[in-house]
Curated annotation (Swiss-Prot):
Protein name per its UniProtKB record: Thermolysin
Residues the entry annotates as binding Zn(2+): H372, H376, E396
Metal-binding listed as a keyword: yes
Species this protein is from: Alicyclobacillus acidocaldarius subsp. acidocaldarius (Bacillus acidocaldarius)
Predominant subcellular localization, coarse grouping: secreted
Residues the record marks as active site: E373, H461 (proton donor)
Length: 546
């Protein structure tokens, strides 16, 4: 949640254009990837048949082999990695591109089949790999690649060798490095000290060169921490801003304490005391009388209460059970570190710093902050957006959008500002970002003003302002850069962006792909000729995203 994360990165950028496709432009449309000269979003009545849904996808790609340029049979180039039925009854499948059995990094295709008809394909596949002679055996070992990544972290980030934790297993991938795909190791270096980090490295498997690196802070591995057996009760306490809240707790007759353990939602909501250390998760919060009014309790009261609000929002509005869709437990640690000016999702739990009292109050005191960070978890379990460049900016925008919608859902002094409750307590009216007016805090509100440098992972906290503005306009309407947008309200805006995130976006999606995904999501929900579809187009036109 840094206002500006000053992190260097080299990016993957995709330029796209929209074109009519196939025999009937009225029925089919395409978003074209200018870098790879292949489609990245195709929609319409693509293919009908009685085959299994995945067979329709393979058959269509083979039929359009000159367009997608996969080379060979599609079933030999793609591996089905996920299949589900969405709330509209569509079969949604995710495929990962492979080269001689090796995953192609970020090359994920999402397909929708409804009533025996293939209706859309989204995602960027790398063409003509069969025409390249790519190495499939590494010249350096996994251990060497990991040592190179850890040493680079020490040299460039922490200035000392970090106490690395177990991360995602290192794997070989085909990495689309600019115009030259190559064999690389994907290495994950996670650590909590001296500063938290969750770095992804692409290490050339031939010579150990660092091809790319970025900090995916919303993932890391926590320690233990066990729930208690007991009776569900309701406690009361005061939050960071002094407001009283009733919270679900658990009484353990064995220990004689009340714990911040909510057994009424999914697999539970658990809140821990970090005790100003950097070891996670800390101790499950305990209290002797079920009243949490001490000043030290405030951050825990808010973290616990707001986690429940976020759970309720996703369940009641979108039918989603916890961040993973399968009722995963929600764990939060407060009082992390001393005066720590940050909050982050670490792949398994939420972590909240106390702030320094001047720049930030305790981060759990902002309901939109809690909603923002837990939405990173939703993104991790759905689109898996790479936290760099435009895909990273979409990642951040989704968290801002749904953090704000959670705030409106709870009706707790809602507005279109981000982090206003906990940022610069001595300055009235200040915030981290604004969705209604991104330029208010120096963020771009139009694609022509986007940041194109390498800091902040390629501007993930900056360029998110472009998408935030589009979402605001879609909800509230208005005129922006001479483009008039008819608002459709917060609820419909949220449903469109949620459907785009969960059922259409892929790890390397960019702004143009997001536009196409939102248009298709609106068509799914409200009809292809609806005002909602027109408003989506207007909103993205207004911010210069086509």
């Amino acid at each position: 949640m840094n206002k500006r994360a000053m992190l260097g990165a080299i990016g993957l950028a995709f330029g796209l254009m929209a074109w009519p496709f196939g025999a009937s432009a009225k029925e089919k449309s395409m978003v074209w990837n200018e870098q790879w000269k292949t489609p990245s979003f195709v929609s319409g009545s693509l293919l009908k048949g009685e085959d299994a849904p995945e067979e329709l996808v393979y058959r269509y790609l083979d039929q359009e082999k000159n367009t997608f340029q996969l080379g060979g049979q599609a079933r030999e180039r793609l591996s089905l990695i996920g299949k589900q039925t969405d709330e509209l009854g569509h079969t949604v499948m995710r495929f990962e591109q492979r080269y001689r059995g090796i995953p192609v990094y970020g090359a994920v295709l999402v397909a929708h089949v409804n009533d025996g008809e293939l209706s859309s394909l989204s995602g960027t596949l790398i063409p003509n790999l069969d025409k390249r002679t790519l190495k499939t055996e590494a010249a350096i070992s996994i251990q060497q690649a990991e040592m190179i990544a850890k040493q680079d972290v020490a040299d460039a980030v922490t200035k000392e060798r970090p106490a690395a934790e177990e991360g995602k297993p290192t794997r070989l991938v085909i990495y689309p490095d600019g115009e030259t795909p190559r064999l690389a190791y994907e290495v994950n270096v996670r650590f909590l000290t001296p500063v938290p980090g969750n770095w992804i490295y692409m290490i050339d498997a031939a010579d150990g060169k660092v091809l790319n690196k970025w900090n995916q802070m919303d993932e890391a591995k926590p320690g233990g921490g066990q729930p208690v057996a007991g009776t569900s009760t309701v406690g009361v306490g005061r939050g960071v801003l002094g407001d009283q809240k009733y919270i679900n707790t658990t009484y353990s007759s064995y220990y004689g304490y009340y714990y911040l353990q909510d057994n009424t939602r999914g697999s539970g909501i658990f809140t821990y005391d970090g005790r100003n250390r950097t070891v996670l998760p800390g101790s499950l919060w305990a209290d002797g009388d079920n009243q949490f009014f001490a000043s030290y309790d405030a951050a825990a009261v808010d973290a616990h209460y707001y986690a429940g609000v976020v759970y309720d929002y996703y369940k009641n509005v979108h039918g989603r059970l916890s961040y993973d869709g399968s009722n995963a437990a929600i764990r939060s640690t407060v009082h992390y570190g001393r005066g720590y000016n940050n909050a982050f999702w670490n792949g398994s739990q939420m972590v909240y710093g106390d702030g320094d009292g001047q720049t930030f109050l305790p981060f759990s005191g902002g309901i939109d902050v809690v909603g923002h960070e837990l939405t990173h978890a939703v993104t991790d379990y759905t689109a898996g957006l790479v936290y760099q460049n435009e895909s990273g900016a979409i990642n951040e925008a989704m968290s801002d959008i749904f953090g704000t919608l959670v705030e409106f859902y709870a009706n707790r002094n809602p507005d279109w500002e981000i982090g206003e409750d906990i940022y610069t307590p001595g300055i009235a009216g200040d915030a981290l970002r604004s969705m209604s007016d991104p330029a208010k805090y120096g963020d771009p509100d139009h694609y022509s003003k986007r940041y194109t440098g390498t800091q902040d992972n390629g501007g993930v906290h900056t360029n998110s302002g472009i998408i935030n503005k589009a979402a605001y306009l879609l909800s509230q309407g208005g005129v922006h850069y001479g483009v008039s947008v008819t608002g459709i309200g917060r609820d419909k805006m949220g449903k469109i962006f949620y459907r785009a995130l969960v059922y259409y976006l892929t790890p390397t999606s960019n702004f143009s792909q997001l536009r196409a995904a939102c248009v298709q999501a609106a068509a799914d929900l409200y009809g292809s000729t609806s005002q909602e579809v027109n408003s989506v187009k207007q909103a993205f036109n207004a911010v210069g995203v086509y």
